[in-house]
Regions:
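Functionally constrained cores in energy, signaling, and assembly domains
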Residues: 1-2, 148
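Beta-rich, aromatic/charged-enriched effector core domains that present basic-aromatic interfaces
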Residues: 2-129
Length: 206
């Protein structure tokens, strides 16, 4: 019995191990995902092509995200065309800092283990400051929606020399580690729009 993995590779490894051992593999649904495999299969059945935009709209509508009744807020499904601006000659201006978190004891032990096992590998963990607890992940989410989300949309694809993060959320690791639920991240972003603190272009783009 295993929780449904989020990668085909891992699923294949599990199935191979079970087959080799003569054990039946029973998968439990991973509720972290917004759409189950069965639900996606029903949506995809009999479609000539699988495109992101129709699926995105279906998920928005079914979850009621940025919706006004049965229609998207403002009448537009996406703001991609508006969110490809550059910074101009003066550059991005002041970019809010991403919060950093002091490694806890478990993380410090893991860093030491990596240093011992892979001393010659590239990179360094000396400045590791990612959230590794639920509490820190929530702090990272709050910092993003309040400080960087409002300016995220229009220049989300823009780059500038020396700018490493810009206004991006840096929440993917916390989501992948399941320190954050995608539903609460979506709700937090939408709440900023509903409260008038972030524009629809930024919130929908995120």
């Amino acid at each position: 019995v295993a929780c449904e993995p989020g990668e085909w590779r891992v699923l294949g490894d599990l199935q191979q191990a079970c087959d080799a051992s003569g054990v039946a593999l029973e998968l439990l649904a991973d509720t972290h995902f917004l759409c189950s495999r069965d639900e996606f299969a029903r949506w995809a059945k009999d479609r000539e092509s699988l495109r992101m935009e129709p699926f995105y709209r279906r998920m928005r509508a079914s979850a009621g995200v940025l919706m006004d009744g049965g229609e998207p807020v403002s009448g537009r499904w996406n703001y991609d065309a508006d969110n490809r601006k550059g910074f101009g000659a003066k550059g991005p201006g002041r970019v809010p800092e991403v919060p950093s978190f002091m490694p806890d004891a478990i993380t410090r032990d893991a860093i030491a283990d990596v240093a011992r096992a892979y001393p010659g590998h590239p990179g360094s963990l000396a400045s590791f400051a990612w959230p590794v607890t639920r509490r820190d992940a929530l702090r990272a989410l709050e910092a993003f929606v309040r400080e960087r989300l409002p300016a995220f949309g229009p220049t989300q694809d823009a780059m500038w020399n020396g700018m490493t993060v810009g206004w991006h959320s840096m929440l993917s690791a916390a989501l992948n580690l399941k320190l954050l639920d995608p539903r609460e991240v979506i709700a937090a972003a939408e709440a900023e729009y509903r409260a008038g603190r972030a524009g629809l272009d930024s919130v929908e783009g995120f």
